[in-house]
Regions:
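Conserved phosphate-chemistry cores used by DNA topoisomerases
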Residues: 1-202
Length: 202
């Protein structure tokens, strides 16, 4: 069905709430791919949004600073900040009930809308179409040469995000991380998880 207004729906929007890690980005991508395949017109209506949460928090006495990207944190932290306590958030489960309430109080500020752009169709097809495996290999190879800052969406400072930017600056990090943890290293024949088990045994 071709939708022209969200008033035709029972809900005004679909909000994705995932962990702020690579696997969370993969889930976002899968949902966007599903909507794009079955109901592409909904993407043009900004029906799909995402709520971002901090990946790092720094506290000192009554002061709290939240960071949504590694680069933003590194820029602020520099060579160290005396007296500041740093907490890393692996996922939503790391947050306390009080922090969850805090996020929902600021939900308007933490919501990012996904926008359709001229590269949306090609980007989603590249990332998910099984017929594009060879193109995907080239895509991943090209991105291994990029700096981390080039493969990062400035969450926390953007309210709208082109879907192609999401694919090429966020989702790609899941694919690169998945390769690292899924393919055995040529030096020892082990995957990272297996190597950690071996390390813990001795």
């Amino acid at each position: 069905k071709e939708y022209t207004s969200v008033s035709e729906l029972r809900y005004g929007r679909l909000m994705i709430m995932t962990d702020a890690d690579n696997d969370g980005s993969h889930i976002k991508g899968l949902i966007l791919n599903m909507i794009h395949y079955f109901w592409p017109s909904l993407l043009k209506l900004n029906f799909v949004v995402s709520m971002v949460t901090p990946i790092i928090k720094a506290t000192k006495a009554s002061q709290t600073k939240s960071f949504y990207t590694d680069s933003a944190f590194r820029t602020w932290y520099g060579d160290g900040k005396q007296g500041w306590k740093i907490k890393y958030y692996k996922g939503l489960g790391t947050s306390t009930s009080a922090e969850a309430r805090e996020y929902f109080k600021k939900i308007q500020d933490l919501t990012v809308k996904f926008d359709v752009d001229t590269m949306t169709d090609d980007s989603i097809v590249l990332a998910f179409d099984k017929k594009k495996a060879d193109a995907r290999k080239s895509w991943l190879l090209e991105n291994t040469a990029k700096d981390a800052d080039q493969l990062e969406v400035p969450y926390g400072s953007v309210k709208q995000l082109d879907i192609s930017d999401f694919v090429h600056k966020d989702l790609v990090n899941f694919s690169l991380a998945d390769l690292k943890r899924s393919i055995a290293h040529m030096a020892d024949g082990l995957k990272p998880s297996q190597r950690k088990v071996m390390y813990a045994c001795f």
